[in-house]
């Protein structure tokens, strides 16, 4: 599985997300693709210091989300599952395994979304 995280001026959140993925899901740096969407908070420099993390930088200005995802998929992903994460959301233990279980439970399913919990209450996924 590859994990794509798109961030704009969210260095601290990206750092926390990476640590949570490592601790809670066993995701290794080589399975991460971080996209710096024209940040000015030092994210690019931080990524350059981590040779184990795959990354892309939008240095000519912010790009739209679909363009970024298509480019990241073209550059780094083969036939593996892809998990798209916003650095504002944290993964709960076993959430990735549950999403994969649901994804493969029926051959007609092509994508799954997690439950979103805000302030301790489940919100419907959109």
Predicted feature residues:
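Cell-envelope/extracellular polymer assembly enzymes that use nucleotide-activated donors
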Residues: 1-2, 31
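Short hydrophobic beta-strand elements that form part
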Residues: 2-5, 83
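Short, well-formed alpha-helical segments that are part of the catalytic scaffolds
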Residues: 10-24
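Short alpha-helix within the catalytic core of nucleotide-sugar-dependent glycosyltransferases
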Residues: 18-19, 44, 70, 93-104
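A conserved acidic beta->alpha catalytic loop
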Residues: 36-44
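Glycine-rich, basic loop-to-helix element that forms the pyrophosphate-binding segment
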Residues: 59-76
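Short beta-strand-to-loop acidic/aromatic patch adjacent to the donor-nucleotide binding site
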Residues: 79-90
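Conserved donor NDP-sugar-binding/catalytic core segment of glycosyltransferases
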Residues: 94-125
